[in-house]
Amino acid sequence: SGSCTTKTCWTTLPKFREIGYILKEKYSEAVHVEAVRATRLRQPTFLKIKKPRTYRKPMVTDLVYIERSPNYCEEDSSTGSVGTQGRLCNRTSHHGDGCDLMCCGRGYNTHQYTKVWQCNCKF
């Protein structure tokens, strides 16, 4: 009897969380640029870095932005941001739901609640 071995290879996407970490890092290192019109005819508009000359030129994989992001901590009806004031947060979390991050350094109030409900338990 003969034996047969096959090898199958395929490409998979990285885990969603890994992509999120990479995007977050790129977002925090994004470069502020401004659009500048070329002075000569038939030359395209180009982007100029709005940092000191010591700053390196962005690579093709870097993120750049033209306008600064709004302050999502404060309510802003023009952007539709409701802000973070009054939202529930997790005091012990170091993620997006954590009080230190969500409350934007403004501090927060803690409340302790006791909830009583009928559980239909049998002993």
Swiss-Prot record:
Instruction: Tell me which SMART domains the record gives.
Output: WNT1
Lipid attachment site numbers (O-palmitoleoyl serine)? S1
Gene responsible for this protein: WNT-7B
Q: What are the annotated glycosylation sites?
A: N90
Q: Which InterPro entries match?
A: Wnt, Wnt_C
GO cellular component terms attached to this protein's record? extracellular space
The entry's keywords? Developmental protein, Disulfide bond, Extracellular matrix, Glycoprotein, Lipoprotein, Secreted, Wnt signaling pathway
Q: Which family does it belong to?
A: Belongs to the Wnt family.
The organism sits in which domain of life? Answer: Eukaryota
Q: How is it modified after translation?
A: Palmitoleoylation is required for efficient binding to frizzled receptors. Depalmitoleoylation leads to Wnt signaling pathway inhibition.
| Record-level GO BP terms | canonical Wnt signaling pathway; cell fate commitment; neuron differentiation; positive regulation of JNK cascade
Q: What is this protein's name? A: Protein Wnt-7b
One MF annotation (Gene Ontology) recorded for this entry:
cytokine activity
What is the annotated localization of this protein? Secreted, Extracellular space, Extracellular matrix; Secreted
Annotated disulfide bonds:
C89-C104
One Pfam family in the UniProt entry:
wnt
Q: Which species?
A: Alopias vulpinus
Answer whether the UniProt record assigns the keyword 4Fe-4S to this protein. Answer: no
Region (Disordered linker) location: 33-61
**From which lineage does this chain's organism come?**
Eukaryota, Metazoa, Chordata, Craniata, Vertebrata
Q: Does the keyword DNA damage apply?
A: no
What is this protein's function?
Ligand for members of the frizzled family of seven transmembrane receptors that functions in the canonical Wnt/beta-catenin signaling pathway. Required for normal fusion of the chorion and the allantois during placenta development. Required for central nervous system (CNS) angiogenesis and blood-brain barrier regulation.
The chain's coiled-coil residues are none
